[in-house]
């Protein structure tokens, strides 16, 4: 059975993936998705994640860019880019989620919608980001 938190992460990744193609309709897509969510806890978490990623997007993108080896941010697939964005947000800003959980979940989402290679790529990048940017308290969760 898939956890509610996995569903939440997938929804946020999908929303930012859609943003790549429908940039001008982001608020509309966000509102439509939010209105479809029945569980109030998931709804609140979804809103917090989306707003957190969106408001910290340039910082998150810079962090990701700085951890790409022999690769540029623009070369990332839309899927990998947005999985990394959500994963980076969660590593840095969601205090009570263990690093290993975040990385594992993002690997699984990357593999589900991409490929085995996407999962390996996401693992390497998020691991480097966690070591340098995750709050020190998260290493003890």
UniProtKB/Swiss-Prot annotation:
One GO CC term, this protein: cytosol
InterPro entries: NusB-like_sf, NusB_fam, NusB_RsmB_TIM44
GO MF annotations, alphabetized: RNA binding
SUPFAM superfamilies linked to this entry: NusB-like
Disulfide bridge positions per record: none
GO biological process: DNA-templated transcription termination; transcription antitermination
Name of one Pfam family that matches: NusB
Top-level lineage group: Bacteria
Record key words, sorted: RNA-binding, Transcription, Transcription antitermination, Transcription regulation
Function description: Involved in transcription antitermination. Required for transcription of ribosomal RNA (rRNA) genes. Binds specifically to the boxA antiterminator sequence of the ribosomal RNA (rrn) operons.
Protein family membership: Belongs to the NusB family.
Protein's name according to its UniProt entry: Transcription antitermination protein NusB
Record organism: Fervidobacterium nodosum (strain ATCC 35602 / DSM 5306 / Rt17-B1)
